Regions:
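His-Asp-centered metal-binding catalytic motifs of divalent-metal-dependent phosphohydrolases/nucleases
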Residues: 42-62, 66, 87-95, 112
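Divalent metal-dependent phosphate-bond-processing catalytic cores, especially two-metal-ion Mg2+/Mn2+ enzymes
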Residues: 1-5, 11-39, 51, 79, ...
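Short, surface-exposed acidic
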Residues: 80-87
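Short, surface-exposed loop/turn motifs that are enriched in glycine and acidic residues
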Residues: 17, 56-60, 77
Length: 160
């Protein structure tokens, strides 16, 4: 799959989100830098990451509109139906926290949580009264990503 082409096709939809394409790029980069994804799962993982917020800014829109938009884009790229269905299943539930998710789901979920600790996004989330940083850290699946989040949280709090 041509990841660059997927980003191009997704861009008009992602630009409508709160953090825009930059958020998706940050999640993508975090995943590439911090998670070992086996070659046979890379396309599924990275397509899911690129398309995870495609439906809009709200979780409701992401879950309801996202899979339909994602399926259309993936069909344009010639992806097979089982691949499309799996990407749509992942993006249509990526804010949930299932007990035993697939590796592509875990990588997306953890990278999407880690981006919250980035210099670009932390101030936004930290200004919201309902954010419980310790709970967010605990929800991260990977031990390594959890340790990274703990370190980033300490750093961001020192900077604030």
């Amino acid at each position: 799959m041509d990841i660059k082409k997927l980003f191009e096709l997704a861009k008009p939809y992602l630009e409508k989100n709160d953090f825009g394409v930059a958020h998706t790029r940050r999640v993508f980069d975090i995943a590439q830098e911090n998670f070992a994804v086996p070659p046979e799962l890379r396309e599924l993982t990275f397509a899911s990451i690129i398309l995870h917020d495609i439906g809009g800014s709200s979780i409701k829109d992401q879950y309801e509109k996202g899979p339909e938009i994602a399926a259309s884009i993936l069909k344009q790229l010639g992806c097979d139906e089982s691949f499309i269905q799996e990407v749509c299943r992942i993006i249509g539930s990526h804010h949930d926290h299932p007990d035993n998710p697939s590796l592509p789901f875990r990588v997306l979920y953890d990278a999407d949580k880690l981006v919250m600790f980035s210099p670009e996004e932390f101030p936004y989330y930290n200004s919201r009264a309902a954010v419980n940083w310790e709970k967010i850290v605990c929800l991260i699946y990977s031990d390594g990503a959890r340790r990274l989040a703990e370190g980033l949280l300490k750093q961001r709090r020192r900077e604030a």
